[in-house]
Amino acid sequence: MNYKLLSVALAFLYIGMAGGCSQPAPDLRYQIEVDKPLQTMEHFGASDAWSMHILGLWPQEKQNQIADWLFSTENDANGKPKGIGLSLWRFNVGAGSTEQGEASQIGSSWMRTECFLQADGTYDWNKQQGQRNFLKLAKERGVTKFLAFLNSPPVYYTQNGLATNTGRGGTANLKPECYEKYARFLADVVEGIEKHDGIKFNYICPFNEPDGHWNWVGPKQEGSPATNREVARTVRLLSREFVNRKMDTQIMVNESSDYRCMLRTHQTDWQRGYQIQAFFCPDSVDTYLGDTPNVPRLMLGHSYWTTTPLSELRAMRCQLREALDKYNVGFWQSETCIMGNDEEIGGGHGFDRTMKTALYVARIIHHDIVYAG
């Protein structure tokens, strides 16, 4: 209702101005009713991939400046905000492609990560130091919520011995006998980072973009597909591990790469589609997670590939909201950036320091909040 009233008021203002000076526009008055909230914004966050493993090893002065820009809620001496005040920080738990070097088949070192787990089954808590530095810098500036996510299981557990899906199909790059080991690894990482760095991961997502076609076709970065059944199996095992250890970290699903996969199938089959229904409709007996301990009734998705044209931007988010409401599921939009299909601003290559890209991203955020939120 409030959105409709605002649209009418703005249209009326435009018409009044078009009528010339003889018809002055009436005064408009807006009232913010803080006692009548229509939405709850839980977090304003960002991710450390694929940069903080490099930037986190820069000179401390530069790290501090970047951290201020990202996390600070303070003002400088002139009253200007020091930063954008992120409230949540996503940490990419690595799979070990950095240690493999060129043998990882991932061309860019920026797209590789270290792994805490070693080949002999022990842990090296000196790994991923750059990213961990930014965990600490975030906490020092008031960030209280942290989410860990994984693009791939550790290379010691994968079927092809890599952190990328090269040469495989659309199933999880995880050995059948390693599902329980993977769950223990995830729990060990949550406990290990809290013990060594004083950072608690409030949330963890075992699979990042398991429906994304990008991680099935070639070695661009760490990544593994997974079917809904494979995701559900992993989440149930991790839930059991958390319960046994009395851990309250919440397990998130599914960090979808495309809203269309949450609603139906898109560039895949039913095994990786209809995700809202698969995980939160009790009739989906093989994949239902609605009664699984440590799993909130919440879906995570990424705002890629449905950002243009403008009519699609809105329509897709309205459809998403309808499906979420049908199954009484909350929603977090947990990742976005400019991609190749964003042709209106020239695609995702190079740099743009003008307001053009900033306004385009703001439009995406607005539609995610207003129509999908």
What are these regions, as identified by a protein language model?
Residues 203-225:
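The feature captures the catalytic groove of carbohydrate-active enzymes
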Residues 217-224, 263-274, 346-354:
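Short, flexible/disordered intra-domain loops and linkers
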Residues 173-180, 221-230, 311, 352-356:
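Alpha-helix capping and helix-loop boundary segments enriched in small/acidic/polar residues
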Residues 21-203, 212, 230-267, 271-285, ...:
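Non-catalytic accessory regions flanking glycosidase/transglycosidase catalytic cores in CAZymes
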Residues 210-211, 257, 300, 304-305, ...:
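Catalytic metal-binding/acid-base residues of hydrolase active sites
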